[in-house]
């Protein structure tokens, strides 16, 4: 007798769940977030490994941009953005119009990381590849390509250079403190030895005094 009521309850909760999921998808579409795949090829002129922090920003001709900070920090273990390596990153950001026509790099670190190319993949669009001709980005400045407007001078992104706390050790180790001075002979004696030595000296002095009389 309770099966029909259970079926009605199940259908009701299923309807609520589907409606909620549909509302979430609508909210995500309204927010305009899209997934992107970023493939970074590091030049063979780059160091074997790097502590540099690499950020990128790419955009379309309408001025929409996607900012992906600290790509190097997403790679764990050896080989991350190292010499001759290829690393893939999943980035989510504002939905861009086709085609993606600008990409800039920001490098912050001591190692001089050298990019070979960066390729951007987006859903339903052809990938776009930006070659960097093995040139090193200047330290903590935006460097890259803007193919969105071929009639005007390419402009750098209107973003300040990212400021990250350094996660790399200093290039040269700090000078170690000088060793402590060596203890004197008296300081090396324990309390018992000091008392015995004082008693022996006092006894010798007393004997010398008696012999003098």
Swiss-Prot record:
Expressed in seeds. Expression is restricted to the developing embryo. Keywords: Glycoprotein, Secreted, Signal. It is found in: Secreted. Residues 1-21 form the signal peptide. The keyword Ligase does not apply. GO terms for cellular component: extracellular region. Residues 147-188 are annotated as: Disordered. Residues 34-148 form the PLAT domain. Residues 157-183 have a biased composition (Pro residues). Disulfide bonds: none annotated. GO terms for biological process: embryo development ending in seed dormancy. Glycans are attached at residue 149. May play a role during embryo development. This is Embryo-specific protein ATS3. It comes from Arabidopsis thaliana.
């Amino acid at each position: 007798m309770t099966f029909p009521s259970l079926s009605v309850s199940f259908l009701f909760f299923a309807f609520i769940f589907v409606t909620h999921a549909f509302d979430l998808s609508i909210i995500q579409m309204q927010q305009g977030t899209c997934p992107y795949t970023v493939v970074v090829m590091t030049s063979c002129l780059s160091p074997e490994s790097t502590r540099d922090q690499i950020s990128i920003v790419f955009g379309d001709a309408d001025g929409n941009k996607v900012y992906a900070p600290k790509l190097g920090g997403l790679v764990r273990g050896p080989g991350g953005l190292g010499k001759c390596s290829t690393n893939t990153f999943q980035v989510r950001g504002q939905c861009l119009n086709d085609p993606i026509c600008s990409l800039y790099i920001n490098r912050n670190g001591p190692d001089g990381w050298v990019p070979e190319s960066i390729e951007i993949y987006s859903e339903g669009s052809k990938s776009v590849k930006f070659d960097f001709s093995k040139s090193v980005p200047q330290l903590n400045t935006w460097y890259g390509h803007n193919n969105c407007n071929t009639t005007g001078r390419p402009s750098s992104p209107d973003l300040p250079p990212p400021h990250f706390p350094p996660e790399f050790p200093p290039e040269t180790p700090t000078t170690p403190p000088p060793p402590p001075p060596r203890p004197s002979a008296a300081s090396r004696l324990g309390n018992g030895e000091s008392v015995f030595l004082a008693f022996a000296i006092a006894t010798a002095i007393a004997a010398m005094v008696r012999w003098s009389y």
